[in-house]
Amino acid sequence: MKGITVLLTAILMLAFSRCNNSKKKSMNEYEKGTYGYDLNFLKEKDKGLIVLKGDNEKAEVIVSPKYQAKVFTSTSNGPDGTSLGFVNHDVLNSDVPDEHMNGYGGENRFWLGPEGGQFSIFFERGREQVFNNWHTPKAIDVEPWDVKEVLSTEVSLAKDMELNNYQGNILKISADRKIKLLSSGQVEQELEVQLPEGINVVAYSTVNKITNLNDFQWDEKTGTVCIWMLDMFNPSDSAATIVPYNVSDEKEPGIIATTGYFGEIPSDRIRYESGILFLKTDGKYRSKLGMNARRTK
């Protein structure tokens, strides 16, 4: 896969499902857990909701300008198919905003750090860094983003923001985000695989960029910001996260993954196999892993 320039990130989300035929139904007939249900629900919350559609009429991706350019959810099998992203209906229905962070959900969402430390953008200068004083910047929590361009399979959004960090500096930032629905052919080309017949696929890439709008450089004195991408999916007993990694010939490529953030991940929940890491993500165990740059693909 092609490399991305500095301050850009690219994410490829994939989901597969067996083909099945479904009759078209009115939106209010879809069951909770289906893509059709979430599409109907989100249209009521964001009148400017954007739906990217593939040429097979089954792959769709929901993007919300109102809710911080989130990819809320997607499907590989049309309205009757499973809604793959986690949509927090209770929070979206609430009339009372959370002063710390509004957990709307989202299959792919733009986030910024650092959350804590001397350059935190989540704490006011001089305030003790405890949860009661922790507040998410509004630009990535409750404010809408601007739509720059919309095509049938891609959308570009942007947001200008000013962030106060723990040093008392105001960091002026322009954030840009492009989301593109990929065809089956593009998936095969990017991943160098042959998709089996009888399989539906939904895949998209996101490219995310931040630009310094200050009249000074960000450095070890002023502080800086970093991009995070946070992804929330609906778990299942068979759900797994697949992470390709480099099988290096170097003498010291480093361990494949750091797996002890919340205690070591049990061996029955993680497996390494010929350059691919498999992590069980059934929602029944909290875990976290990381890879160094020499291992990541």
Predicted regions and their residues:
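Bacterial Sec-dependent N-terminal signal peptides
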Residues: 1-29
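Surface-exposed acidic/polar loop and edge beta-strand patches at domain peripheries
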Residues: 20-205, 209, 213-219, 223-297
